[in-house]
Amino acid sequence: MEVGIKDQIATNSILEAEGIYFSYDNGYDVFENINIEAGQGKFIAIIGPSGIGKSTLLRILGGFLKPDRGTVRLLGKPLYEPIPEVALIHQSIVTFPWMDAKENVMLSMKTKDMSKDEMVEKAKESLSRVGLDGFEDLYPKEMSGGMRQRVAIARAFAADPYVFLMDEPFAHLDELTAEGLRQDIYNILFSGETPLKSVIMVSHNLTEVLELADEIYILNNIPATVVGKVQVTMARPRNPRSDEFNANLDMLYSYLTPPRKKK
């Protein structure tokens, strides 16, 4: 039965991981021949059982960890270290308590050829884009968790990256705040104003994944491999209460069996 997902993906690659192998220092093999592409203007999700290595993979994609074998490329060029063009938004909310909101955002512009006045203006603009217009002088202790996460996301926006790597970015927020932030991020990134942007997100929340993603990669096994990749073809906006949405959701849950060690 057609439920809106097809096992075929066509991409115009912005970020690409090819033949990634990785093991921890203790010899534990984590990944075996991982291949992932993030196409232009695409929202990519990576799912899999807990402990499979999704966050570790995100760090490899961002240049924070070096694979044992394989290559990560940004716009066709090998990526060997973290660069401003690839922004990582952590699961834990990272803000610096001695800096106000705009100063937190300005940190991502330190490598750019900008005056302080230009950085302040850019920081205010980025905060406004995530719904914090007029809150630029607040310190983290004066903000809710949702506001602090918006500051962290505004900091990533201000760097003008090609790719956003998002590690469970809504995990510690209440559902109402998370829903508003999800929609804000999607609208900002894919409104047509930033056509080169791509997102790769890892999440345990499959409803969230299905609501946002264009393409979904499924990790499983030990060492982890990509056991499936699917394209979501449902029209937007997607209604989590619809029969079509729930049929897709059931299919995704079927992939999340406990990982098995490869023979």
Task: Enumerate the language-model features and the residues they cover.
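Helix-to-loop junction immediately C-terminal to a conserved catalytic motif
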Residues: G62
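Conserved ABC ATPase "signature" region
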Residues: M106, D117-F135, D184-F190
